[in-house]
Amino acid sequence: MQQRQAVVAKTAARYQRSRKKEKSMILSELVELTEYSRAYARRVLRQHGQRLKPGKQSLVVDVRLRAPRQRSAFYDEKVKAALLKIWRMMDYICGKRMQPALAEMVVVLERHNELHCDRLTKQKLLRVSAATIDRLLRTERRKYELRGKARTKPGTLLKHQIPIRTFAEWDEQQPGFGEIDLVGHEGGVAAGDYCQTLDLTDIATTWTETLAVRNKAQARVFEALQKVRKNLPFPLLGLDSDNGSEFINDELLRYCKHERISFTRSRPYRKNDSCFVEQKNYSIVRRAVGYARYDTDEQCQLLNELYSYLRLYTNFFLPTMKLKSKERVGSRVKKRYDQALTPYQRVLQSKLVSKAKKDQLRTKYATLNPAALKRKLERLQQRLAKTTSQTNWRECARMVAVTAAQRTNPF
């Protein structure tokens, strides 16, 4: 660097007093010696040694310390504040999911007097891109990273009667074919009884229904499945579960045969066979109620009250993206997704859902306020959090000690 500066200092005076043709030759020599770009070398030679005299001071120009160009931000603080409010209301989703639904969400929030912005701010909101949304919200995004454990006890007696799901047997483009799973709320301690959430996800529309049960007894899970089925906006045509005994049982098998529901199961120890519902286990259930231990009747009732609002919030207002294709390029996998749509919009687009059912959904949608639903969910989450007291954790510790003692001393 010092050698380059010495060459520039020696060449600059000769360059500044030379004619145009001579300057071109001097410039070529400097580029060859220093490996500067021609434009940068020209500017260094032209401005080297120049002096500025602001007031009584005399400053020598150093072109290497050029001030960055100042440009006013197009998306100002008003846009960022409105975007932040909508983003929080939409449960902190990414820009690619948020941007396609932004125009509709602005209309809905204005209709319910939840969003107030001037005409220019609204125009900017409607033209913002997904990448810009992520950039503007970058400082607010790094939160809520949680991990969980799966606890499924296999059921083996009826496996040979329930076929493993294949793509030939299922029509994943038709609403009504869904995956089911249980999410355990054991709080990291699997001893004793604790609440379970039954999660049913439709593959075609991503419509998701959840219901809490007191434990994973077959009778409770079967009763919850019947209730969940009634909430679906289309007929239930197929069920796919893991190999847990709460699903692989004679009662559910006879029920599916009687109701003409295709009942299949995933391959043992292949968790990705149920990838759709496993994704919702986190994005809907875990994000809403966390990883604490819930093992009382009061907590089970609170969970179901929360889920009654959560189903409206997620199915009508939270967009989802579905994978269209995967292509391996070298060591990387390039994935392509469809446009983000809410489950409600996917149901309306389906030609296999009746017009009467679509009209019912439109009527229901017109009455819903997403901001009010979000506030209600947050209040219920706070009530649920208060029930996880220190006494609860002491009871967990006691059950762990009892279980450990039984293992070490079986008599």
Predicted regions: what they are:
Residues 1-238, 243-411:
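Secondary-structure boundary/capping micro-motif
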